[in-house]
UniProtKB/Swiss-Prot annotation:
Pfam families: Ribosomal_L28. One of its GO terms (biological process) is translation. Gene3D superfamilies: Ribosomal protein L28/L24 (2.30.170.40). This is Large ribosomal subunit protein bL28. The keyword Kinase does not apply. Residues 1-28 are annotated as: Disordered. InterPro entries: Bacterial_rp_bL28 (IPR050096), Ribosomal_bL28 (IPR026569), Ribosomal_bL28/bL31-like_sf (IPR034704), Ribosomal_bL28_bact-type (IPR001383), Ribosomal_bL28_sf (IPR037147). Belongs to the bacterial ribosomal protein bL28 family. One of its GO terms (molecular function) is structural constituent of ribosome. Disulfide bonds: none annotated. It comes from Bacillus anthracis.
Length: 62
């Protein structure tokens, strides 16, 4: 799946953008995903990982 964190499963969220007149327009908030090289099952792979997962140490870059 594209644009989904392989560690935490974080992905884009949807909601409404509200104008001053409170008109609603659909929009998306993307997760802060970084494409990094990590070792998974002994192989080096390039995967999308959220910045929060990187900062918390759930995954380590290669």
């Amino acid at each position: 799946m594209a644009r989904v964190c392989t560690i935490t499963g974080r992905k884009a969220r949807s909601g409404n953008s509200r104008s001053h007149a409170m008109n609603a327009t659909k929009r998306k908030w993307g997760a802060n995903l970084q494409k990094v090289r990590v070792r998974i099952d002994g192989k080096v792979q390039r995967v999308y990982v959220s910045a929060r997962a990187l900062k918390s140490g759930k995954i380590e870059r290669v």
